[in-house]
Amino acid sequence: MQKPMIEHMTSCGDWAEKVLETNPWLQQLILIGPQAKDIEQLYREKDGLMNRKEISEKLLTFSAEEIHTGEDKNKISKMKKNLPVYISIDKDILDKQYTETNWSQGNMSLPMLERWLSHFLENGNILGIDICGECQQGIPLPEYLQAEELNEETNQKLFEFLSHYIL
C-alpha cells in the first residue's frame, strides 16, 4: 500500500497496514481491488513484524486481477460472517471513467464496486463508512473542475447506493 508523503501521517493507503499491525481486536481485514503487486508489497513489508500465517489469518485480499479473471469467487467463502463491519472506500480502485484521484488509478467499474459492497451491506451490521480518493489539487483549473464534477457524480451515485442500505 502506498506510503503517505508526510511521515507519521495516516493516509487512506496505509491505514490498513497500521490496523493489521496494531489492532488486537481485528477479526478480519478485507482488501478489495488493489493491484496484486500492491498486495504483495504489504506482505513483504510485514515480514518480520508478522509472519505470513498471522497475516493470512486476518487479511483476505481480492486483487484487481482476481476480480477481472473471476478467481475472486473462490475466496468469497473465506469472508467471516456476522461480524460488525467498517467500510472504507478508496475511489482510486475505480477506473478513470468514474473518478480522477491523486494516486495511482485502478480499473474497477462502479457497478462492480457496488456488487462487492452489497456483500457487506446486506449483513446489516455496519459500524461506519468513509469514502476517500479525491482529485489532486493544484492542477490547472479547467482539468480540476472537470475532475471535481466527475468525482461529485460518483460520490452522489455511491451515496444513493449506500442510502438504500443504511438510511
Which functions belong to the PLM regions below?
Residues C12-W15, Q41-D47, K73:
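Distinct, well-ordered alpha-helical segments
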Residues P24, Q28, K46-G48, K53, ...:
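Short, flexible coil/linker elements and helix-boundary hinge sites characteristic
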Residues K37, K53-E54, K58-L167:
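Catalytic cores of soluble, metal-dependent hydrolases
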Residues M1-K37:
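Active-site histidine-anchored catalytic micro-motif
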Residues K3-I6, Q41, I139-P140:
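A generic structural signal for short coil/turn motifs at secondary-structure boundaries
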Residues G33-I55:
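Active-site-proximal loop/helix segment associated with metal-binding centers of metalloenzymes
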